[in-house]
């Protein structure tokens, strides 16, 4: 009989908040915002759901998803070398990789399929026709499923019993969504920000996480379950700082003043 493991919900929620915030900040601040400044433009406004640059173009648009791709791949490598016994740290990097790579690949599929969002300008700029669009959609879908399998592999030692992994993922997914919505609620056009940006980029792009526990449990041998995630002051304080800063700064957005 499996020994029941009690993971601390507050610490898990903190890991989820920080992991999701890494994707949001990478996309909007480092990606779009960084490219805007690097190309000599100025940021007119920047929030958790939109960046308005004085310059426009495919480079700035693609910088957001490409920043997610870069951070996601880096996190994947870190998670791969993290000690299996370092449960919170390894779980954090697995989640960072999952949120960033699911954002990149999920948005790629949606943007190319609908001709909107970050990939739209690039498709127009480079005259990408139907065959190219179908190819990009296939690449995005493949990347999403590879990310799903990676996340499941990273959760194997947390998946016995399956209810343990299910609880962890549900807390993480809900925390990400609530954080995104709480931040967007302070936007000057809150309803639009919530319905068209915050909810899709948090709940929908990462919805594949909800199937991770079943996949992880199917691969679990129950030979070396990870230690329980205990209450961690440093993770909780870190999440509190990032969460409050995100809501109060990126929520209403930063607007340039002349």
Region locations from a protein language model:
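Alpha-helical membrane-embedded segments
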Residues: 201-211, 238-244
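Membrane-interface helix-boundary motifs at transmembrane edges
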Residues: 80-90, 156-165, 222-229
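Short, Lys/Arg-rich, polar N-terminal cytosolic tail immediately upstream
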Residues: 1-9
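Metalloprotease/metallohydrolase-associated module, dominated by Zn2+-dependent proteases
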Residues: 45-46, 52-154, 169-180, 184-188, ...
